[in-house]
């Protein structure tokens, strides 16, 4: 602060190179001593620069700074005009300020970056002596006037002269002064900036004693302290300054722990329109570092050969190729996440125009695709295709069922024709001729009449009509005479002669 205030009195001190910034605190100490000596000698220049009442209105030191007790950071405004300041005596004439103001943040400050230089400028413009900044923190503390702090430097602490002329005022003969903000220091030794000055010089040269307990001590800076007039994004934060960030703000991380950023949309659009440019392609491929998602079937070959697909995806990890540029543009939207097509009804976005068209049909109820088999309508062609496959499967099942039924019927017909009962009769019929022919004479001689009378031939002939009709030729060739009499005559002839004698009376009785 002291360095900034000494630079304001340019004609009196003849400071060489007033725009050199920053100054060391020890560079301006001889000049301060010279100013105090001039003031104690009664130099009219210093007394004319600022009236005695300009600093202390009624002669009471610190009266003008009663409203600055405590934390006065939010009470000082840059827009406060000169007319708002209350002075008991003469007011300063309006002065037009021209020049260049340079505020450079102190990188070695442990807490704030802009507070002290900013309020040095505010105090110079408004005309109020700001309270000195506490050394460990950048918050402004209303401890005592700056004039007393400058007079409490060891080199000039013994003088009890008035230091009111050292206030932030402008010499009337210099209409265009140039102000430079004082540098901020992260630490300072107590012999340069003591915490509280025991002696405060008055305007009449008498010294009054003030206890240090009257003023609040320097409080530690809150890590969440921030100047509301300066946005946080105007300066970059180093790794050692992450503790300065408020807890509700995320610190800036390095690119090593982050996911690589997506390629800008204008870059991909330019690549899609100028795919043939090799220089452009090399530049864009260097920017496309985001790993793409794996393909569902990476080893499946494409139907189109590679030489017929000249449009390759610019993403390094994507091996997709396309035969048309619009297909490539549509594919690139997968990587970028661009959805330029928006539904005007529900405001939903889509990456493809055909997806938007089919989506609009859900709102309108339009179903232009009808099934050719059952007539059912669908809003999308793929839905109709999927529905048609159901009919095809049903048709195939019916065809399979019909084929199995036909096969079963043919097999049953073949089995019936192969195992018919008519074909089983020839063997027993053909086996009888030998025993019948072996006894032709006994049957005809002994029991010719009884058999014919007991079992008439018409009854026997009606018993087996099919057999006699089916094998008429075979039976006729083998047995030209009565077949029935030959078949049933053999059991009668087999009994013994005594049985024949016993049966003969019965036959006689029957007759």
Curated annotation (Swiss-Prot):
Q: Where do the coiled-coil regions begin and end? A: none
Phenotype upon knockout is: Knockouts show subtle abnormalities in the inner plexiform layer, outer plexiform layer and Muller Glia cell tiling.
Where is it located? Nucleus; Cytoplasm
Spans of biased composition, class Low complexity?
Answer: 137-169
Output one GO BP term: embryonic viscerocranium morphogenesis
According to UniProt, the tissues expressing it are described as: Detected in muscle and brain.
> InterPro entries, from UniProt?
EGR1_C, EGR_N, Znf_C2H2_sf, Znf_C2H2_type
Location of site Interaction with DNA? 309, 320, 324, 330, 348, 352, 376, 380, 386
For bias type Basic residues, the affected ranges are: 386-396
First and last residues of each zinc finger (C2H2-type):
311-335, 341-363, 369-391
Task: Report the GO molecular function annotations.
Answer: DNA-binding transcription factor activity, RNA polymerase II-specific; double-stranded methylated DNA binding; hemi-methylated DNA-binding; promoter-specific chromatin binding; RNA polymerase II cis-regulatory region sequence-specific DNA binding; sequence-specific DNA binding; zinc ion binding
Ranges where the record places region Disordered? 133-169, 291-312, 384-406
Q: Name one GO cellular component term.
A: cytoplasm
The job of this chain, per UniProt, is described as:
Transcriptional regulator. Recognizes and binds to the DNA sequence 5'-GCG(T/G)GGGCG-3'(EGR-site) in the promoter region of target genes. Binds double-stranded target DNA, irrespective of the cytosine methylation status. Regulates the transcription of numerous target genes, and thereby plays an important role in regulating the response to growth factors, DNA damage, and ischemia. Plays a role in the regulation of cell survival, proliferation and cell death. Mediates responses to ischemia and hypoxia; regulates the expression of proteins that are involved in inflammatory processes.
PANTHER family referenced in this protein's UniProt entry, alphabetically:
EARLY GROWTH RESPONSE PROTEIN 1, KRUEPPEL-LIKE TRANSCRIPTION FACTOR
Its domain comment says: Binds to DNA motifs with the sequence 5'-GCG(T/G)GGGCG-3' via its C2H2-type zinc fingers. The first, most N-terminal zinc finger binds to the 3'-GCG motif, the middle zinc finger interacts with the central TGG motif, and the C-terminal zinc finger binds to the 5'-GCG motif. Binds double-stranded target DNA, irrespective of the cytosine methylation status. Has reduced affinity for target DNA where the cytosines have been oxidized to 5-hydroxymethylcytosine. Does not bind target DNA where the cytosines have been oxidized to 5-formylcytosine or 5-carboxylcytosine.
Name-wise, this protein is Early growth response protein 1
Species the sequence originates in: Danio rerio
Its lineage opens with: Eukaryota, Metazoa, Chordata, Craniata, Vertebrata
């Amino acid at each position: 602060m002291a360095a900034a205030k000494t630079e304001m009195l340019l004609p009196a001190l003849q400071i060489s190179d007033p725009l050199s910034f920053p100054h060391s605190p020890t560079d301006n100490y001889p000049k301060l001593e010279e100013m105090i000596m001039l003031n104690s000698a009664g130099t009219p220049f210093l007394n004319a620069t600022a009236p005695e009442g300009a600093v202390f209105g009624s002669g009471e030191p610190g009266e003008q700074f009663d409203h600055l007790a405590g934390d006065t950071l939010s009470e000082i405004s840059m827009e406060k005009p000169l007319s708002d300041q209350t002075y008991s005596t003469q007011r300063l004439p309006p002065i037009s300020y021209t020049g260049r103001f340079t505020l450079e943040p102190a990188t070695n400050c442990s807490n704030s970056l802009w507070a002290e230089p900013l309020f040095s400028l505010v105090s110079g413009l408004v005309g109020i002596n700001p309270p000195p900044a506490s050394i460990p923190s950048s918050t402004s503390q209303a401890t005592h006037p700056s004039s007393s702090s400058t007079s409490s430097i060891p080199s000039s602490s013994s003088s009890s002269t008035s230091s009111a002329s050292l206030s932030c005022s402008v010499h009337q003969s210099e209409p265009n002064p140039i102000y430079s903000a004082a540098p901020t220091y992260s630490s300072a030794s107590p012999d340069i900036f003591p915490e509280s000055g025991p002696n405060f010089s008055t305007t009449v040269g008498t010294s009054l004693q003030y206890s240090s307990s009257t003023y609040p001590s320097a409080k530690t800076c809150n890590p969440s302290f921030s100047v509301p007039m300066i946005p946080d994004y105007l300066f970059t934060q180093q790794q050692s300054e992450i503790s300065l960030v408020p807890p509700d703000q995320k610190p800036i991380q390095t690119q090593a722990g982050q996911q690589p950023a997506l390629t800008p949309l204008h870059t991909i659009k330019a690549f899609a329109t100028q795919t043939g440019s090799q220089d452009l392609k090399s530049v864009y491929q260097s920017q496309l570092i985001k790993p793409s998602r794996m393909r569902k079937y990476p080893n499946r070959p494409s139907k189109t050969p590679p030489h017929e697909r000249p449009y390759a995806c610019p993403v390094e990890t994507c091996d997709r190729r396309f035969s048309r540029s619009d297909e490539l543009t549509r594919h690139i939207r997968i990587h970028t996440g661009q959805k330029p097509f928006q539904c005007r009804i529900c405001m939903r976005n889509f990456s493809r125009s055909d997806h938007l068209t089919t989506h609009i049909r859900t709102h309108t109820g339009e179903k232009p695709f009808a099934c050719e088999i059952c007539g059912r309508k669908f809003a999308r062609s793929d839905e109709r295709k999927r529905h048609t496959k159901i009919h095809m499967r049903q048709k195939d099942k019916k065809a399979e069922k019909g084929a199995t039924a036909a096969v079963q019927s043919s097999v049953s017909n073949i089995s019936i024709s192969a195992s018919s009962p008519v074909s089983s009769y020839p063997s027993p019929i053909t086996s009888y001729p030998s025993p019948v022919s072996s006894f032709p004479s006994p049957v005809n001689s002994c029991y010719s009449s009884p058999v014919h009378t007991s079992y008439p031939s018409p009854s026997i002939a009606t018993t087996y009509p099919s057999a006699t009709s089916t094998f008429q030729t075979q039976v006729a060739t083998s047995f030209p005479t009565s077949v029935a009499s030959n078949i049933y005559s053999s059991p009668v002839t087999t009994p013994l002669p005594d049985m024949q004698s016993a049966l003969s009376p019965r036959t006689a009785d029957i007759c």
